[in-house]
Amino acid sequence: MDAIQKLNDAIAKVAGGNDLYDTYKETWQYLLESYIGGEEYRRANHLVRYQLETEPEYQARLRTTPLENHCASVISVYNSFLFRTEPKRDLGSIENLAETYDFMRDADFDGRSLDNFMKDVATWTSVFGHAWVVVSKPNINATTRGDEVEAGVRPYLSVLTPLVVLDWNWSRSPSGRYQLNYFKYLEDVNKDVHTVKEWTNDVITTTVIDMGEETITDTIIEPNGLGKIPAVCVYNKKGVVKSIGISDIADIADAQRFIYNATSEIDQSIRLDSHPSLVKTPETNAGIGAGSIIHMPENLDPGLKPYILEFSGASVDKILGAIQHQVSNIDKMANTGAVRATESRVMSGIAMETEFQLLNAKLSEKADQLELAEEQIWKLFCEYMGYAWNGDIDYPGSFNIRDTGSEIAQLKTAAETSPNDPQIQKGIAIKVAEWMELEYDEDEVMPTTTPEDRPVHMQEMIMGGYEDAQILALHPEVTQNDINNARTALLTNQGE
């Protein structure tokens, strides 16, 4: 009995998490279900169960209730802006290493490039608030770097969600910097067989546990040649507790669950309106379907004749209004109202600009955290390769989020207000050309046209492929009417 108890204690120690893990585990699981959606969300039973509702009825309601996955939508919007422009990397002394080239193309030995890997890291940090990246290098007891190159050995990355990082501990170095001195995570799960890896500054311990048989089947201990734990905690936004970040969807997930339950209520309301309940005595024989016949006993009391049970719950319109209110709240929390809008919304120019600025600030903060994390990753990469990191990583710090349709409408109004002012027309033309991403030299000098030679010159520029915006920018004295007249004359001449 003592031996069995000792074994159970050993398994619990190896496979168990620390207090922070136990505290946040359910929250992390809920956030993961909210992001993934689909069958995972359905199995989590996030629908509120009715009183006296049987299990088959509840399961049927789960199967017929769709999920509007706002969590995934918001994170997708963030990532689309974050990685629209690739980060700039100056890798310094390791720029031309073959290992660096391979690492950039296949960062995790699973075919993902470093950019794609960092995009996954950004996704999981948005979901959980933080994620861990482990930089590993296989130990093959190579004596020279040539042996490692021949064997294809180089550092690679692994991203770990908080749900698999079971235990960790920080300590302060003499310089005051925090450093990990213990790190334990669940490396692999194959049915009942769990593989747990523990890192210290000196050794790496890999333990294989058969949870079904409750036995430890294998333990591998190897030296940690790096002398430190190569794990990087990547934050979405730092929280008050070290190693615990703030999720982007913590509050959005609750609103999404409300919408999920409200959608179920709409389904039930429609079903009750279309197929109301019939109250009758056991002796009354009622058919099923439209126009069915009801047979009542001849001696039935008139007060017991069948009748329809009227449904008096909340109307569908009221529930839809509540859902729309929650969608609006989600957009406010995520600062994505103007970006995720699927229909025209009444927003003033100042309100829209303010929302764009708030979204830009949020994205800039996320980009700064990714930039900091990638620099730490490259430092560990260099330590494995025997180099000192002297490079620089630069993620975009500002994101061009604009309502171009509104801007073009404003420019059109301005052009119609002052059609004969060449300076205003030129400024408008330049703005339109920027929006259209036209390439031309604004400082290019063009001879000023006269009313006599202007039509011919306009026709030459049109034939040369110049856009209207380019012509207006290069010739302040020209108006849009001049260009239209030249184009009309050109078409007439070609027709003749």
Where does each model-flagged region fall?
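N-terminal start-of-domain structural block
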Residues: 1-41, 199-241
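Surface-exposed polar/charged interaction patches
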Residues: 10-17, 27-38, 53-54, 77-84, ...
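Extended, regular secondary-structure scaffolds
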Residues: 122-239
